[in-house]
């Protein structure tokens, strides 16, 4: 009976220790993350996107470190000489013994992903030519992307093979459209030049500029990019370079202005007629 009471007392004391350590670790993680947030909020050393990326990384590192440390602590309470076993087996052997090769792969991939600055939190990306969305979280093991529909995707860093980033300094907008053979090319050029002038005025704050404040590549007619395309018409292309953050909104504005100008000047675009014959 006394032995049972002794074991119960020891077990209860360990439970108290476990809860105490869990609370301390939770508070420590919270304080570290909070300090990082306050530091970036009160300073302006780096860009906002990079600040959010670092915050995401610190949050991931502290959570993983606290969790692993807590697990080792709990095991050490119930396994005698766990520290000696850990030192003798080696950390690498224990990790492999737990079958965590995929974890190592994901963590290493995450480190290189962040170190090489392939993306930042808030960037719009395409991953592996399959997933499109805005980067919400960059962790040591996984990457979270929010699709336009609102769906949140979590991708293991080790599975990321290709990244297309739409938020690296600038983006070039190119719009191509087919005009009827019946239209005078010179008249089409004149209408498009007027449309480009309107775009450069309307989107002046979105244009990518050089160190002197001049537009790097204002909206202009790229030229006739195809003749007799698919036996239907002549292809004209308009292009311009904008800031990466304004790419999607600027693209919508470009299409709106071009369509409006072509319509107001009665420039005939292609129409596809479908002929249906009935047999008696």
From Swiss-Prot:
Keywords: Cell membrane, Membrane, Transmembrane, Transmembrane helix. It holds the Pfam family MS_channel_2nd. It comes from the Bacteria. The chain crosses the membrane at residues 15-35, 68-88, 94-114. Disruption phenotype: Cells lacking this gene grow normally in minimal medium or in high-osmolarity environments, and exhibit the same survival capacity as the wild-type strain upon a drastic osmotic downshift. They sporulate and germinate normally. One of its GO terms (molecular function) is mechanosensitive monoatomic ion channel activity. It is a multi-pass membrane protein. Induction: Induced by high salt concentrations. SUPFAM superfamilies: Mechanosensitive channel protein MscS (YggB), transmembrane region, Sm-like ribonucleoproteins. Its main location: membrane. Belongs to the MscS (TC 1.A.23) family. This is Uncharacterized MscS family protein YfkC. It comes from Bacillus subtilis (strain 168).
